[in-house]
From Swiss-Prot:
The lineage of its organism: Viruses, Duplodnaviria, Heunggongvirae, Peploviricota, Herviviricetes. This is Uncharacterized protein ORF123. It comes from Ostreid herpesvirus 1 (isolate France) (OsHV-1). It comes from the Viruses.
């Protein structure tokens, strides 16, 4: 089941590929605890142009998750290509990619081993003609969409639990759910908070109405917990977007387009999968990724 571009507005192939590569490059700079997934930006060449190689480091849990999604999303036609470029590595090992010697940094992964996925990720649009991608464009879209969906399991659990518990979509409860989603996305961006978050989330599916209300309160209480590190998400951006969420769909979308790449990674994920799914229910997407490129707005959707 491939990712599809629902709205492209004459964006040529090179710009679409560049947007996806830029997304990979940005996302790879942070860690997330959702689904026990770990990844990090490891190395990149040609910062001022030419062909750059982006590396994503994944632990065995991540590889197992990809295997599960291979079955669920019927990606068998492309899975062989993914496996062929996954290289198992060990601490102290030096691997060579595109003639570049890359030492394995033990800070790049957990438990003493990891997997490198190599992608050609040009930093500038004009460099794409010179690049020889290890995956073709469609395969690159598919991989990113699968990976994105794994991270979003946490939000899916929350939304499903809200629905099952009869939480009504009205201003107070919607704002409560909005705060909860913000909190969770902020918290999972910090891997030191992993145990706290997973302990809260693991019980969600079994909750009745009363327990779910307690769960909301527990999350809000944790906001002030000394065990949690502060997150750098902009409070001003949150307040503006919360107002737009309630009042003005078009203003919210325009605000996101103007400010998207200046927001925190965790807040980007929250916007992509919570607000935009609310703004565009007619798309009936399981996941949405939103890319503003200049004056253009591109929506990636996985049914």
């Amino acid at each position: 089941m491939a990712a599809s571009i629902l709205q492209a507005e004459n964006i040529e192939l090179r710009k679409r590929l560049n947007a996806v590569c830029e997304y990979v490059d940005m996302e790879a700079k942070c860690e997330t605890a959702a689904g026990k997934i770990f990844y990090k930006h490891c190395y990149q060449t040609a910062k001022n142009g030419g062909t750059g190689t982006g590396l994503i480091c994944m632990n065995p849990d991540m590889l197992h998750a990809m295997e599960l999604f291979d079955e669920e999303l019927s990606l068998k036609d492309n899975w062989t290509n993914f496996k062929n470029i996954l290289i198992k590595i060990n601490i102290g090992q030096v691997i060579t990619i595109h003639g570049q010697a890359i030492p394995v940094n033990p800070n790049h992964y957990r438990n003493g081993e990891g997997y490198y996925l190599t992608l050609v990720a040009p930093k500038k649009t004009e460099a794409i003609d010179d690049a020889v991608p290890l995956l073709d464009t469609e395969q690159l879209y598919r991989f990113i969409m699968c990976y994105h969906e794994i991270k979003m399991d946490l939000i899916d659990w929350i939304e499903r639990s809200a629905s099952l518990s009869g939480l009504q979509v009205k201003l107070d409860s919607a704002n409560h759910a909005l705060n909860m989603a913000e909190y969770v996305m902020d918290t999972i961006a910090d891997p030191t908070n992993e145990d706290i978050v997973l302990q809260c989330i693991s019980e969600v599916n079994e909750m009745d109405n009363a327990k779910f209300g307690h769960f909301l309160g527990k999350l809000n209480d944790l906001l002030d917990s000394p065990e949690l590190k502060p997150n750098s998400c902009s409070d001003i951006a949150r307040k503006q977007l919360r107002y737009f969420y309630r009042v003005d769909k078009d203003s919210a979308v325009n605000y996101i387009a103007d400010n998207y790449f200046n927001l925190d990674i965790s807040f980007k994920e929250f916007l992509d999968n919570f607000m935009l799914k609310t703004f565009y229910p007619e798309l009936n997407c399981k996941n949405i990724m939103f890319y503003p490129i200049g004056a253009k707005k591109i929506v990636f959707c996985m049914k």
